[in-house]
Amino acid sequence: MQLKASEVYEALKKQLEDFDELSELSEVGYVISIGDGIAKVYGLSNAYSGEILQFSTGTKGIVFSLKDNLIEAVVIGSDDQIKQGSQVKRTQTSLKVPTGKELLGRVVDAVGNPIDGKGEFINPTYLDVEVKAPSVMCRDSVNEPMYTGIKAIDALIPIGKGQRELIIGDRQTGKTAIAIDIILNQKRFHLSDQEREKVYCIYVAIGQKRSTVAQLVKKLQETGAMAYTTVVLSSASDAASLQYLAPYTGCAIGEYFRDNGMHALVIYDDLSKHAIAYRQISLLLRRPPAREAYPGDVFYLHSRLLERAAKLNKAKGEGSLTALPIVETQNSDVSAYIPTNIISITDGQIFLESELFYKGTKPALNVGISVSRVGAAAQIKAMKDIAGTVKLELAQYHEMEAFSQFGADLDSSSMQLINRGRRLSELLKQSQYCPFSVEEQIIVLFAGINGYLDKVAVSKVKEFESNMLEHFRIHNPDIMNEIISTKKITEIISSKLHQILQEFVKSIEQYS
């Protein structure tokens, strides 16, 4: 019997119509062993390093090691539900996290999921957690100031937008307090209509207590700073994998603003705990330990994170991402492995000393070994001129004070230098949650270096400073606006400042 072509065609057509198309084609592997957040998986020979795997329980993992017929994946979160023999699928994607202005005012976990009970994000932009840092040709020099509101930093250790500045010191020396004050200081720029002046903040808490972070978030909400801030939390009770991912997630959130022509500030608190989490993962993966049991690539761990902070050029939108990593030292030992690594990666460090902190100097900055390698280029001329004199007078004061310890008789000029140095040191002290605008800082330091506090008792310096600024705000706001608009102290501004300060000092008896 001979079949007609039309009959064959109709039969094939009917069969194809009844054919169920596979909804999904995926590579599947199986868990050989699971423990301590590390899964050994067989059967996914085409997986690549950094790829996201999907376990049958719904949990996700990241490929960390590739071996013959075997891969090792780090489970993101808890591995309680994963058993030996569980099915694992490739996703053929790397980890992406939600970013955008929708995240402002929110608290998210290490992979960007909201944990503040305010609901899911509606339309976020998803970005890769691990990306290459901008190339040299995409960058511009650091030329815009990042105002911290802290006199000692803005004058002596200035930070620019796009800089990486390390905050380093022993526990309980005020490292987080400085970071929070910097976030609070950005509020004054968000109250203005100039979008270019606004700085969006990302605070990454690594290995901290949830109660501590809750207090911090409450403070940001009370001051109105949460409106332009995102908090990324990976608490001490979270898995090492989440503590490892948190800084990269925070960086990706900041990169959204940087790449869209805006300014962002990301604070990593702190990278010591981040390194410890990575050390734990590496030892569980049986990677060979090096100095202090850290793996050999711990430098790359932090360099690839911090190199993503950048000031982009005009062609790329002139956005910036400023990074403030925090590192905790043991007994002020800055020569330990992680501190020296991060010091060599960053553009300077703010060193906090426990001795100064216990003496009541807050912020407890050691001006001698704190440095900013690129921020001075971003300082406005008015601050640069005053800061130079402040640095010189403080250096002379510390040298002369050390000399006076020997009980030597000092002449009148040396005594005057010591007296002024003491008052300048007192001026640089600052209470927490009290940021100063740049024009206020310039006026305060101008008064200090020109001898207007020489007759003020050291114990009354803070009171004098407060009343002087109040006098300027009420009676001379025009001079403050003039300093900001011109960005330098002209002869006219200088003579006006001298005149106002001379009149104010006539009532000095109450402070002497």
From Swiss-Prot:
Q: Per the UniProt record, which residue ranges are transmembrane?
A: none
Under the heading CDD domains, the entry gives: ATP-synt_F1_alpha_C (cd18113), ATP-synt_F1_alpha_N (cd18116), F1-ATPase_alpha_CD (cd01132)
Q: So what does this thing catalyse?
A: ATP + H2O + 4 H(+)(in) = ADP + phosphate + 5 H(+)(out)
Keywords associated with the record: ATP synthesis, ATP-binding, Cell inner membrane, Cell membrane, CF(1), Hydrogen ion transport, Ion transport, Membrane, Nucleotide-binding, Translocase, Transport
Q: Where is ATP annotated to bind? A: G169, D170, R171, Q172, T173, G174, K175, T176
Assign the protein's first listed, main location to one coarse class: membrane
Please give the superkingdom of this protein's source: Bacteria
Report the EC number(s), separated by commas if there are several.
7.1.2.2
A single Gene Ontology CC annotation of this entry is: proton-transporting ATP synthase complex
**Localized where?**
Cell inner membrane
Q: GO molecular function terms here? A: ADP binding; ATP binding; proton-transporting ATP synthase activity, rotational mechanism
Q: Where is this site: Required for activity?
A: S370
Instruction: Note the topology in the membrane.
Output: Peripheral membrane protein
Tell me the HAMAP family matching this sequence: ATP_synth_alpha_bact
Q: What does this protein do?
A: Produces ATP from ADP in the presence of a proton gradient across the membrane. The alpha chain is a regulatory subunit.
Complex and partners: F-type ATPases have 2 components, CF(1) - the catalytic core - and CF(0) - the membrane proton channel. CF(1) has five subunits: alpha(3), beta(3), gamma(1), delta(1), epsilon(1). CF(0) has three main subunits: a(1), b(2) and c(9-12). The alpha and beta chains form an alternating ring which encloses part of the gamma chain. CF(1) is attached to CF(0) by a central stalk formed by the gamma and epsilon chains, while a peripheral stalk is formed by the delta and b chains.
Q: Which family does it belong to?
A: Belongs to the ATPase alpha/beta chains family.
Q: What is this protein called?
A: ATP synthase subunit alpha
- What species does this protein belong to? Orientia tsutsugamushi (strain Ikeda)
